């Protein structure tokens, strides 16, 4: 008789996701074998914004695709609240509940649209996960408006919309599921500066509403703007983590990476080199150029 091993959930109060000893191989046990994730472990708290950065091919997207079951772990364990995703499972239990808990906004979410009206596209996810048509319809109108489009768009064909409008519709469909965790994979790809600012506002709003947010990006100024914690991957390994200033002020670490320092951090470093009194700017930890200007004015005013 097989001994049943009871799995112990490692999550504590205030935590939402735990990853333990996760490894992932492509083309495993062949001459083309590649180790994409290398023994990754981390525990993520609720209601924080995590930015995952690193070179192309460092394993960022592969990592987050494990979080909602798009990729099932071959090695290692993942807990999302009380839902277990593990190497020994044939299939993930509570799969629908997992998808309700974690949703991914892919790099070009507009390519996920496939219905003949905007309303049907937004309603698709909530209905697939068990909501009534009535409830899904109400959420379609609500989240479309949250994305800056009027209710009159509901009956429009999504394929007649502009690229930016399509992206808003696709994101509205994901928000309508009302997940506790949102993952954004290169959310600003192809956006103009105003679109980037709008996306950062969306991420801040998601945190303000109590959600946990993951963002994969190569735009370091956006990382500084929104991140509570930064995780740096290299060849599938977690090589550094901390708040944005801990990461971006570590010159010895950055020297061995291709990470481009955000302009705000570079200006602070230059000012400190000119006059050490500007070291107090590090106490303000400005996240953008406006905050930096305020911090500089404050420093000058108080001599």
Curated annotation (Swiss-Prot):
It is found in: Cell membrane. Its EC number is 7.-.-.-. Forms a stable energy-coupling factor (ECF) transporter complex composed of 2 membrane-embedded substrate-binding proteins (S component), 2 ATP-binding proteins (A component) and 2 transmembrane proteins (T component). It comes from Mycoplasma pneumoniae (strain ATCC 29342 / M129 / Subtype 1) (Mycoplasmoides pneumoniae). Keywords: ATP-binding, Cell membrane, Membrane, Nucleotide-binding, Translocase, Transport. This is Energy-coupling factor transporter ATP-binding protein EcfA2. GO terms for molecular function: ATP binding; ATP hydrolysis activity; ATPase-coupled transmembrane transporter activity. One of its GO terms (cellular component) is ATP-binding cassette (ABC) transporter complex. ATP binds at residues 54-61. The keyword ATP-binding applies. The keyword Transport applies. Its main location: membrane. Residues 17-260 form the ABC transporter domain.
